[in-house]
Every structure is written in structure tokens, then in C-alpha cells.
């Protein structure tokens, strides 16, 4: 919840807009999203999955982001309790309870460059790379991610610059995407 006062110049509009998931009060750097079903990827193969993820609320004065308000954030530890990373947590059952304007699909491209079949149950996505576009119908579109598995316990997750969905006429960029990578070293 946001509580505070904003000094607004008389001609600057104040707007509430969707924003990619943020680190919340703990300042976490990643989003751990658990898949509804396990996904098995054969050696040398690739596939894509779509996962619903939560959005936060951005408070803007003109084109300036004032603050981000996380909407019902949940947290989980990825890895062992003494070395793991605290992440923002998302799963299908949590996100389905949110209003459609507070969630969006993310496309995650899974690629297996190992020599064995891998089972993928989750993805840990760096938050700082996620961007957000708005469609002509005012639908929020988050940027996609790529998960490349090197072994049963090691993968690289990289954010991409394009929206997860191909929608005609997407031109409004609300949050600039960047390429960021997270190394999943505690299993898939």
C-alpha cells in the first residue's frame, strides 16, 4: 500500500499504470515462477511455455515513475536455506486470483543444450530486465525470457527485449526492457 504525499506541478498529470513485478519490501532481484505441470525437454530440443505472472502498480507524475506498489507479493527461497536466493514467488494458482489487469502472460523459451532429458519445474527470472508494453487495447504485455539448460541442475535465464505476445500495433513502451541473466544453479 502506498502512503505519502506527491508534490505535483499544476500541469503534470498523475497516472496509475501497470508495472512489471518488483522486488517489493525485501528488494529481491528475481521472480521464481513455478509451472503448473513439469516440462520435459529432450536433448538439443526447444519449446515455449506461457506462464501468468503478477503485475505491480506504478504511480507516475507525467513520464516520471514516482513509486511502484507491489500487489500481494509472495516470496520463496530458491536453493538451500543457507545459500539460496530470496525471490518474488508466482504460480498459476496465486496469479489466477488476481484481476486480469494485474496479471500478464510471460513467454519462456526453454532450450536444452545438455545431452540428457531435463525436467523443468520452475524458472527464476531476473526482475531488472523485464520491460512492459501496452497494446492498443490497453493490455499490459511483459517481455519474454529464455531458459537454456546446460545440465539437470544448471540453467541460464535471460530476459529478452520483445513482448511475450505478438499483438498488432504494440508501440507504447511503458517500462524499458533490458537483457539480464540469472544462473539457476540449484536445480530446475
Segments (PLM) and residue ranges:
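Interface-prone segments of viral and bacterial extracellular assemblies
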Residues: 1-188
Amino acid at each position: 500500500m502506498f502512503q505519502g504525499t506527491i508534490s505535483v506541478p499544476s500541469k503534470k498529470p498523475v497516472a496509475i499504470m501497470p508495472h512489471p513485478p518488483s522486488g517489493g519490501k525485501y528488494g529481491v532481484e528475481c521472480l521464481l515462477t513455478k509451472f503448473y505441470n513439469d516440462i520435459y525437454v529432450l536433448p538439443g530440443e526447444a519449446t515455449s511455455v506461457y506462464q501468468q505472472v503478477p503485475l505491480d502498480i506504478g504511480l507516475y507524475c507525467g513520464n516520471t515513475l514516482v513509486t511502484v506498489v507491489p500487489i500481494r507479493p509472495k516470496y520463496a527461497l530458491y536453493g538451500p536455506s543457507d545459500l539460496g536466493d530470496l525471490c518474488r514467488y508466482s504460480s498459476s494458482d496465486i496469479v489466477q486470483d488476481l484481476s486480469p489487469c494485474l496479471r500478464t502472460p510471460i513467454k519462456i523459451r526453454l532450450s536444452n543444450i545438455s545431452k540428457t532429458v531435463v525436467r523443468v519445474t520452475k524458472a527464476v527470472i531476473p526482475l531488472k530486465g523485464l520491460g512492459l508494453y501496452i497494446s492498443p487495447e490497453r493490455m499490459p504485455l511483459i517481455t519474454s525470457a529464455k531458459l537454456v539448460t546446460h545440465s539437470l541442475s544448471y540453467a541460464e535465464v535471460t530476459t529478452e527485449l520483445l513482448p511475450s505476445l505478438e499483438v498488432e500495433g504494440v508501440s507504447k513502451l511503458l517500462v524499458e526492457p533490458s537483457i539480464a541473466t540469472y544462473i539457476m544453479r540449484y536445480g530446475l
